[in-house]
C-alpha cells in the first residue's frame, strides 16, 4: 500500500497544480523568508522526501531521475517549476484529448485566485517555447489506461467526499486528477466548439499588462537550468518544466468555462487543502504500480505495456500512464477562463502559498517524469505535434487574469531567488541518486543526439532504430516492455552478416564440386558393378549352355544305344503288321476316346491289344532313313514322333479330367470301330506291363525319353500268339531289315496329319478391307500377311507395327487417285434425273441395298455406255480394276433381276420413269452381254498378274540368297575367321573347344562379346581383321561387301513355302475357272461382241499357264536350294519345331549382316583415309628426292649485267 499511496500522492500535485494555480517556488520562498516561516517549511520536508523515495522504489531509476530534477530545480530557481507546470498543461492538452470534461467538477472548488496568479507566466512561456523549443513541447506519448474504472468513477462523483477520505495520501487531488483524465476527450470537443475567440475578449487586456515582467525574468531562469544540467538533458528538462507551466496555466481557465460552483465550496476546498501535510504524488500515477526490472510482480501490481517507438523510449518507461486518459489541462484552461471567480484577498493568497508548500515541493519531483511522458507522447501521436505547435501561439486566448492576480504577480517578481532548501534526508543517499541520474542523462543525451543528428527529421521524426533491449542496456532500471515482442533483437543480430557474399559463393562452388565428384564416383562404381555382373552372367550362361549340350549328347547316346539293342533283339516277328495297324489306329482316334472310357475300359482295351509290345523300333528307324520327307509312310519316323504327334494337335484344347471310378468292362472303345478300320479284330491281351507305359502318354501329352526307353524294353519281352491279320491285308509281311529295300505301303493317314494344313488355310487377313471413295493408283508392293497363330523365334516389325489412321483421306485420295485423261462427264446418277415430275418413286429393292447402289452410282463419274465399252473391249484405261470390281460386287442378284425385269415387261414407258435410280442402274448393267462372266475374266486377269509377280519375287529372293550363301567365297572366309577366333577363345575347354563348326544361331550374339576395355566387340574385330588381312581391295572402290545384302535376307525371312504353294494352287484354280467363263462368253456372245474379248483373253490364258508352270518349277528349285543351304551349314531346327523355315535361317543372317555391314562401312572409310595418307606421303618422298634446286634470276639484274659486260667490252676495244 505504500507504493500505491505514494503513487496517489505523487499524482496529486500534478493535478493540483493546474487546478489550484499555486505560485512557483520562487515566490513562495520569498514570501516565507520575508514572514519568517522557514521553520515550518523545513519541518514538513523530511516526510515528503521519505514519501518520494518510498513511492519510487519499484521504479528503480525513475526515482533517481525525478528526485534529482527536484533538487536541481530547488538549487537553481523556483520559477522553473511554474514554467514546467505551464508547459505540461499545454502539451497534455494537445497530446491526449481524452481528458478534461470530467475533471471540471472537481477543479471548481479550488481558489480561482491562485490559478490566476500564474496567468502572466503562461503567456510568456508559451510564446517563447512555441518559437524556439517546439521539439521539447511536443514530446508526448500515448498513455495506456491502467487505473480501475470504479476508483476513478467514485472519485469523480463527489468531490466533497474525496476531501474527507484522502487526508493521509492526498485523495482529493488524486480524484481531481482521475476525473480530469476521464473528461479530457469531452473537453477537447467542447474547446473546439467554443473556440478561442471568447478567451481573447476577456484576457487580451491582462496579457498586454503582464507580459513584460515575465519576459524579463523567464530567460534568466531558463539559462540557469541549462547551465546546471551538464549532461546534455537541458532540452528535456526544459520540456518537463514547460509542461508543468502549461498544465498549471491552462487548467484554471478550462474549469472556469465548464462548470461554476459557489464560493463556499472554494473556501471549504481551500480549508481542506490547508490541513494536508503528507506528500502526495500526482494523479498521473494514481492507478499504476510498476515493478523493478527483474523482480516478480506483486498481487496488486499492474504492469503497463509500453510500445517502443523512437529514441526517447527510456523516457517512455519513466512514466506509467493512467487507464482513463492523459492529462489535458489545456482544454480545461479554456473552459475555466469563462468561469467567474471571486477575487481573493492578498492574505488568502499568502496563506494558500504557505499551505501548499509541501505539494509544490513534491511537484518539482514530478516535473521531470511528466516531461518525459509528454516527450514520448509526441512520438506516439503525430497529430498531437501539430496541435502542439499551434496551441502555444495563443496564450492570451486561454488566460484570464484579475487585478489581484496581477498585483500578486508583480509582488512575486520583486523577490529574489530563495536560499537553497535544506533537506533532512540522508546526504549520501541523495548524492548516490544524483550520480545515477547523471549517468542516465549521459545515456539519454546520446540517444537524443543520435536522433537529432539525422538530416531531414523534423521535431516529430524520431529515429525508430532503438530497440527495447538496447534502451534497457543503456538506461538500467527502466520498465521492462511487455508488448510488442522484442523483435528488435533479431534486427540487432543483423547489424553485421556472419559471412560475406564471396564466402557464400565459395561455399556454393565447393558444394557443387563435391556433388559432381560424388556423382562421378557413383557412376564409375555402378559401371564397374554392371561390368562384373555381366561377366558373371555370361559365365553362368556359358556353363548352362555347356550343361544343356552335354545332357543332349548323353540323351542322344542313350537313345542310340537303346535303338541298337532293340534292333539286335527285336528282329522281324510274325506280329509286325499288327503293331503297325494298332499304332495307326491310335493316331486316328479323337479326343473323346481318351476322355470317355474309364480305367476299366482302358484295361479291357489294353488286355485285348498286344500291338504296343510288338512295335519294332528297327523297322521304324529304317523307314525314317529311306522315306525322308514322306510323312504318310506306313512306319512313322520314331516312337517319339508317333506318341507326340496326336496329343499336340488334339489334346491341348481340352485336357482330359482324371479317370472316373472303374465300371464293369465295356465293349472295345471307338478307336476300333468299323468307321475307322473296317474288319479289325481285337487282338489278344498283351503282358500286364505293356499298357502302363504307352496309354498315359497318349492321354496326357508327348512322352519323355526315359519312359520311351522303358516302353521299348517292354516291347522286347516275349508275347503271346498274335491275332490274325486284317481280312483285306493278306498274310503279314515281315519288316525289312535296316539295310533292306523299301518298307511296305503306308496305311491311310489319320485326321491329325491334315490338321496343320487346314488350320493355316482357314485363317484370313488380320486387317479389314479398305474401300477408297475413288479409284487410286496401285502400289505394287510385296504384301506380307501375318497369321495370328504364327510364332517366330524373333518378333518381326510387322507383328508389332501399328498402322495409324489417316486423318485426311480426301487429300490423299486427290493426290494419289488415278488420273483420267478424258473429259469430265456427267455422273451416272444425273442421267436418271431428267424426268418429268414424278408423283411417286417406285422402289423394288430394300432400303439398305438401294442405298448401297445409290452410293456407288454417285461415286461413278461415268456413263453407262463407257462402262459397256470398257467391258466389251477389255479396256481398263477408262474403267479401272477397282471400279470394275465394285460393279461386279454390286451387280443385281438373280431374284432382284427377276423383279426388275418383270417390272420392265409389265410397266408402261411412263411408269418406267418412276422407277428409282438404283433399280434402273442395275437393269442397264444387266443388259451388257455376259456382264458377270466378262467382268470376272477381266478382274482375274489383273489379279493373276499381281499374284504371279508376287510369287516370282519371293521365289527369286529365296533362290538368290541361298545361292549366294553357297557360292560366295567371302562368306566362307568370314565364317572361317569366326571359327578360328571361337576355337581360340574356347581353348582348353573340352566341350566347346576344337570345334569343326558352329551353329549359326551364334552369329547375332557375336556383337554381345565385348573386349576387355568395352571398346569393341567380336564382330568389330572380325571385320577389321578381314579388311586388313583378307580383302586386298579394302579401302578402294573395288572393295565389295563380302556378304549378301541385309535387305535380301530380310525379304527372304518373310517367305513361307506353304504360302507360296497355296498361292500357286489358288492361281491355278482361278485360272481354270476363268478359262471356263471365257469359253462360255465366246459361246453365248454374238459376233459383234465377241472380239476383241476372245482374242485378248485367249492370249492371256495361254501366257498365264506358262507363267504358272514356270513359277512352280522355280518354287521347287528354291526349296531344293534352301534345303541344300540348310544342310550345307548344318542348321538344326529351332527347339520345339520340326522343320527349318526360311524365317529362322534368314533372320539369323539378317541380324549378323546388318551389324557386319555397319562396321564394314566405317572401317572401309578409315582404311581409305589411311591409304590416301600413305599415298600422299610416298608422293611427297618421291618429289623430294627428284627435286632440282633452281635459282631464280632477276631479269632486270641480268639485263644490267649484260649491259655492263657490253660496256666493258666496248671500253676494252
Curated annotation (Swiss-Prot):
The keyword Plastid does not apply. It is found in: Nucleus. Residues 187-210, 431-464 have a biased composition (Basic and acidic residues). Residues 636-647, 755-764 have a biased composition (Polar residues). Pfam families: FH2. Its main location: nucleus. Residues 652-751 form the FH1 domain. Residues 650-672, 680-689, 718-751 have a biased composition (Pro residues). Present in the adult brain, kidney, brain, heart and intestine and throughout the embryo. One of its GO terms (cellular component) is actin filament. GO terms for biological process: actin cytoskeleton organization; actin nucleation. Residues 1-24, 66-111, 144-169, 183-216, 357-489, 624-774, 1193-1213 are annotated as: Disordered. One of its GO terms (molecular function) is microtubule binding. The keyword Protease does not apply. Keywords: Coiled coil, Developmental protein, Nucleus. Gene3D superfamilies: Formin, FH2 domain. Residues 766-1182 form the FH2 domain. InterPro entries: FH2_Formin, FH2_Formin_sf, Formin_Cappuccino_subfam. Residues 428-450, 503-572, 1050-1125 form a coiled coil. Belongs to the formin homology family. Cappuccino subfamily. Is important for morphogenesis of limb and kidney and may be involved in determining dorsoventral neural tube polarity and motor neuron induction. It may also have a function in differentiated cells or be involved in maintaining specific differentiated states. This is Formin. The gene is LD.
Amino acid at each position: 500500500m505504500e507504493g500505491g499511496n505514494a503513487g496517489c500522492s505523487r499524482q496529486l500535485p500534478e493535478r493540483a497544480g493546474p487546478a489550484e494555480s499555486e505560485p512557483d517556488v520562487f515566490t513562495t520562498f520569498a514570501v516565507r523568508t520575508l514572514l519568517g516561516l522557514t521553520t515550518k517549511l523545513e519541518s514538513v520536508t523530511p516526510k515528503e522526501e521519505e514519501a518520494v523515495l518510498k513511492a519510487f522504489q519499484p521504479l528503480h531509476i525513475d526515482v533517481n531521475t525525478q528526485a534529482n530534477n527536484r533538487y536541481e530545480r530547488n538549487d537553481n530557481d523556483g520559477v522553473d517549476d511554474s514554467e514546467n507546470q505551464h508547459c505540461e498543461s499545454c502539451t497534455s492538452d494537445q497530446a491526449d484529448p481524452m481528458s478534461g470534461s470530467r475533471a471540471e467538477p472537481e477543479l471548481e472548488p479550488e481558489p480561482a485566485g491562485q490559478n490566476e496568479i500564474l496567468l502572466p507566466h503562461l503567456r510568456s512561456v508559451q510564446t517563447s517555447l512555441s518559437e524556439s523549443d517546439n521539439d521539447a513541447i511536443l514530446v508526448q506519448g500515448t498513455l495506456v489506461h491502467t487505473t480501475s474504472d470504479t476508483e476513478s468513477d467514485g472519485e469523480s462523483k463527489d468531490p466533497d467526499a474525496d476531501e474527507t477520505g484522502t487526508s493521509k495520501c492526498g485523495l482529493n487531488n488524486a480524484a481531481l486528477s482521475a476525473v480530469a483524465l476521464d473528461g479530457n476527450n469531452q473537453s477537447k470537443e467542447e474547446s473546439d466548439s467554443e473556440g478561442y475567440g471568447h478567451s481573447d475578449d476577456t484576457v487580451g487586456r491582462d496579457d498586454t499588462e503582464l507580459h513584460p515582467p515575465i519576459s524579463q525574468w523567464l530567460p534568466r531562469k531558463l539559462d540557469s537550468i541549462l547551465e546546471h544540467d551538464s549532461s546534455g538533458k537541458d532540452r528535456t528538462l526544459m520540456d518537463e518544466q514547460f509542461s508543468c507551466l502549461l498544465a498549471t496555466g491552462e487548467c484554471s481557465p478550462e474549469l472556469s468555462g465548464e462548470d461554476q460552483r459557489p464560493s463556499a465550496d472554494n473556501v471549504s476546498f481551500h480549508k481542506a487543502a490547508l490541513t494536508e501535510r503528507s506528500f502526495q504524488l500526482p494523479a498521473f500515477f494514481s492507478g499504476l504500480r510498476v515493478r523493478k526490472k527483474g523482480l516478480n510482480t506483486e498481487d496488486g501490481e499492474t504492469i503497463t505495456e509500453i510500445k517502443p517507438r523512437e529514441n526517447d523510449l527510456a523516457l517512455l518507461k519513466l512514466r506509467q500512464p493512467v487507464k482513463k486518459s492523459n492529462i489535458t489541462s489545456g482544454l480545461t484552461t479554456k473552459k475555466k477562463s469563462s468561469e467567474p471567480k471571486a477575487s481573493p484577498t492578498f492574505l488568502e493568497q499568502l496563506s494558500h502559498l504557505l499551505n501548499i508548500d509541501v505539494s509544490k515541493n513534491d511537484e518539482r519531483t514530478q516535473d521531470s517524469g511528466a516531461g518525459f511522458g509528454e516527450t514520448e507522447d509526441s512520438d506516439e501521436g503525430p497529430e498531437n505535434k501539430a496541435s502542439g505547435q499551434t496551441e502555444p501561439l495563443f496564450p492570451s486566448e486561454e488566460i484570464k487574469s484579475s487585478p489581484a492576480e496581477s498585483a500578486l504577480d508583480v509582488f512575486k517578481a520583486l523577490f529574489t531567488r530563495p536560499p537553497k532548501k535544506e533537506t533532512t534526508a540522508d546526504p549520501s543517499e541523495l548524492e548516490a541518486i544524483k550520480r545515477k541520474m547523471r549517468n542516465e542523462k549521459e545515456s539519454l543525451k546520446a540517444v537524443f543526439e543520435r536522433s537529432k543528428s539525422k538530416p531531414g527529421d523534423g521535431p516529430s521524426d524520431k529515429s525508430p532504430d532503438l530497440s527495447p533491449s538496447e534502451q534497457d542496456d543503456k538506461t538500467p532500471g527502466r520498465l521492462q516492455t511487455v508488448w510488442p515482442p522484442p523483435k528488435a533483437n533479431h534486427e540487432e543480430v543483423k547489424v553485421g552478416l556472419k559471412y560475406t557474399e564471396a564466402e557464400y559463393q565459395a561455399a556454393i562452388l565447393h558444394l557443387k564440386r563435391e556433388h559432381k565428384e560424388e556423382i562421378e564416383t557413383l557412376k564409375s562404381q555402378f559401371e564397374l558393378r554392371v561390368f562384373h555382373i555381366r561377366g558373371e552372367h555370361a559365365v553362368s550362361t556359358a556353363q548352362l549352355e555347356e550343361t544343356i549340350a552335354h545332357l543332349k549328347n548323353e540323351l542322344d547316346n542313350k537313345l542310340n544305344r537303346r535303338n541298337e539293342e532293340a534292333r539286335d533283339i527285336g528282329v522281324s516277328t510274325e506280329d509286325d503288321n499288327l503293331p503297325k495297324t494298332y499304332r495307326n489306329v491310335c493316331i486316328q482316334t479323337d479326343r473323346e476316346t481318351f476322355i470317355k472310357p474309364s480305367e476299366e475300359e482302358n484295361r479291357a482295351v489294353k488286355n485285348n491289344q498286344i500291338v504296343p509290345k510288338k512295335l519294332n523300333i528297327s523297322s521304324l528307324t529304317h523307314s525314317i532313313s529311306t522315306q525322308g520327307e514322306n510323312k504318310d509312310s506306313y512306319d512313322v519316323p520314331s516312337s517319339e514322333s508317333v506318341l507326340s504327334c496326336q496329343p499336340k494337335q488334339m489334346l491341348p484344347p481340352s485336357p482330359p479330367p482324371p479317370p472316373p471310378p472303374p465300371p464293369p468292362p465295356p465293349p472295345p472303345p471307338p478307336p476300333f470301330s468299323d468307321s475307322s478300320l473296317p474288319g479289325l479284330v481285337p487282338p489278344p491281351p498283351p503282358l500286364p506291363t505293356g499298357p502302363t507305359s504307352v496309354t498315359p502318354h497318349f492321354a496326357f501329352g508327348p512322352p519323355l525319353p526315359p519312359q520311351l526307353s522303358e516302353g521299348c524294353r517292354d516291347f522286347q519281352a516275349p508275347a503271346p500268339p498274335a491275332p490274325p491279320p486284317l481280312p483285306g491285308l493278306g498274310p503279314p509281311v515281315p519288316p525289312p531289315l535296316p539295310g533292306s529295300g523299301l518298307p511296305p505301303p503306308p496305311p491311310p493317314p489319320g485326321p491329325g496329319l491334315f490338321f496343320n494344313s487346314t488350320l493355316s488355310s482357314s485363317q484370313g487377313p488380320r486387317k479389314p478391307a479398305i474401300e477408297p471413295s475413288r479409284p487410286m493408283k496401285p502400289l505394287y508392293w510385296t504384301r506380307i500377311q501375318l497369321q495370328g497363330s504364327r510364332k517366330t523365334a524373333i518378333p518381326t516389325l510387322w507383328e508389332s507395327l501399328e498402322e495409324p489412321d489417316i486423318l485426311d483421306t480426301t487429300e490423299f485420295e486427290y493426290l494419289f487417285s488415278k488420273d483420267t485423261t478424258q473429259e469430265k462427264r456427267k455422273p451416272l446418277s444425273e442421267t436418271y434425273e431428267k424426268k418429268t415430275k414424278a408423283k411417286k418413286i417406285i422402289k423394288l429393292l430394300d432400303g439398305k441395298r438401294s442405298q448401297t447402289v445409290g452410293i456407288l452410282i454417285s461415286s461413278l463419274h461415268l456413263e453407262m455406255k463407257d462402262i459397256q465399252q470398257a467391258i466389251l473391249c477389255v479396256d481398263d484405261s477408262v474403267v479401272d480394276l477397282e471400279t470394275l470390281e465394285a460393279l461386279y460386287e454390286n451387280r443385281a442378284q438373280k431374284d432382284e433381276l427377276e423383279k426388275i425385269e418383270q417390272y420392265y415387261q409389265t410397266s408402261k414407258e411412263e411408269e418406267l420413269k418412276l422407277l428409282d435410280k438404283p433399280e434402273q442402274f442395275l437393269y442397264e448393267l444387266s443388259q451388257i452381254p455376259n456382264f458377270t462372266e466378262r467382268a470376272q475374266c477381266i478382274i482375274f486377269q489383273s489379279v493373276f498378274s499381281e499374284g504371279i509377280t508376287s510369287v516370282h519375287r519371293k521365289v527369286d529372293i529365296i533362290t538368290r540368297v541361298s545361292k549366294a550363301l553357297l557360292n560366295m567365297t567371302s562368306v566362307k572366309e568370314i565364317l572361317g575367321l569366326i571359327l578360328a577366333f571361337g576355337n581360340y577363345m574356347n581353348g582348353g575347354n573340352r566341350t566347346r573347344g576344337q570345334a569343326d563348326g558352329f551353329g549359326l544361331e551364334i552369329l547375332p550374339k557375336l556383337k554381345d562379346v565385348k573386349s576387355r576395355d568395352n571398346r569393341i566387340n567380336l564382330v568389330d574385330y572380325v571385320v577389321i581383321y578381314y579388311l586388313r588381312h583378307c580383302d586386298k581391295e579394302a579401302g578402294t572402290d573395288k572393295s565389295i561387301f563380302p556378304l549378301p545384302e541385309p535387305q535380301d535376307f530380310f525379304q527372304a525371312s518373310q517367305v513361307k513355302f506353304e504360302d507360296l504353294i497355296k498361292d500357286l494352287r489358288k492361281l491355278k484354280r482361278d485360272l481354270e475357272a476363268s478359262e471356263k467363263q471365257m469359253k462360255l462368253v465366246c459361246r453365248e456372245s454374238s459376233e459383234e461382241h465377241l472380239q476383241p474379248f476372245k482374242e485378248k483373253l485367249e492370249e492371256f490364258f495361254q501366257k498365264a499357264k506358262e507363267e504358272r508352270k514356270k513359277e512352280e518349277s522355280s518354287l521347287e528349285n528354291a526349296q531344293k536350294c534352301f534345303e541344300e543351304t540348310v544342310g550345307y551349314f548344318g542348321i538344326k531346327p529351332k527347339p520345339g519345331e520340326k522343320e527349318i523355315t526360311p524365317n529362322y535361317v534368314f533372320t539369323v543372317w539378317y541380324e549378323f549382316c546388318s551389324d557386319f555391314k555397319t562396321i564394314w562401312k566405317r572401317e572401309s572409310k578409315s582404311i581409305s583415309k589411311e591409304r590416301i595418307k600413305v599415298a600422299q606421303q610416298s608422293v611427297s618422298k618421291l618429289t623430294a628426292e627428284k627435286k632440282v634446286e633452281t635459282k631464280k634470276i632477276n631479269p632486270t639484274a641480268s639485263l644490267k649485267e649484260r649491259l655492263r659486260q657490253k660496256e666493258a667490252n666496248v671500253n676494252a676495244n
